Swiss-Prot record:
Subcellular location: Cytoplasm
Keyword Amino-acid biosynthesis part of the UniProt annotation: yes
Range of residues in the leader sequence: none
Species of the source: Pseudotsuga menziesii (Douglas-fir)
Name of the protein this chain belongs to: 5-methyltetrahydropteroyltriglutamate--homocysteine methyltransferase
Amino acid sequence: FALESFWDGKGNASAHAMEMTK
């Protein structure tokens, strides 16, 4: 997946990314 999907613009892990990596 793209880093943009894992990190939001503020440099925090996005909720969607956490769901994908869970």
